[in-house]
Amino acid sequence: MLLSREGFTIDVVARWLRNSVLNPYLSVPFATGLAVVSARKNGASGLSDVRFDTAQRVAFLVALASFVLSTTEYLNKWSANNWTTDDTWNFDKEIVVVTGGSSGIGHSIIKHILARNPRANIVVVDLAPLSWEPPRGSNIHYFKCDLTDPKALKTLCTLIRTQVGDPTVLVNNAGIARGYTVMEGSYTDVELTVKTNLIAPFLLTKEFLPHMVRNNHGHIVNVGSMSSIVPPLRIADYSATKAGLTAMHESLQLELKYIHKAPKVRQTLGIFGFIRTPLVPFDPGQPHFMMPLLHVDSVGEAIVNSLYSGFGRTIYLPGIMSSVAALASNRACTALRTTLTDS
């Protein structure tokens, strides 16, 4: 599509540029052609054309930029997946667990999976009842569970394994935000946020990972947030849990490769801006062109695309978040974080 679900944004412009000007299959041959023409022209006349030389330099810089971008993307993709492929993925046979699947991002993920595989085995884990009707003939299994209760979570995992099977895909999506300052929030607010957003994903991963490691096959998706990079006001506990989720993701990536010797177990991390869900029913008031309020299906589709690709990755939405993450990783860059928070 020419535009995104969010309308005309910087991501749309970036996609246009990436598919045209910054496409190395176009820019490199073009720059090479200009170089050949320039060499022949200068050789024949013994003179150089300033305007032509300027165009040639610009074409060379664009070609170089496109080559660097493509090379970086290539290295990021394969290093994140341990330079291995897994051709055994079959979503008619996989068992997918989605926490927080009764609405929002979780529902969108399930919807996009069913659009590709109507008979996919999907386990929905949520404390709230389903806000949608499962399609007739679909293999949707709903389990009600309070993920803040470790005993209930342990029982849940046993039930899933005995009634459905060992999951091969785990989507840690469930999350809450209480919306209080550090000083105003109660002990209960902090505990609920940390248990739901960080401890539950950690324990669920711990429960289902052994089967994935034994078979060297699986995919864990962690739904993160830009707040782990640029923490906004009033959700310090939420931001801390999302930063912890990112740390778990990165540490597990190393453990899978070097300790468990399961290089084909994939991981995907989503770094998302504000998304129009029950968690964010309001417009945060950020500049739409740079930081649009994301459509829930943009997020769900991106996650499902990653699952069906057979490769793990880090998803940045809006795309500008990748640049923000690179800059904000420098803890001395307080000006950037303050500016983004103020906006």
Set out the residue ranges of the language-model regions:
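Rossmann-fold scaffold of SDR-type NAD(P)-dependent oxidoreductases
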Residues: 99, 165-175, 197, 222, ...
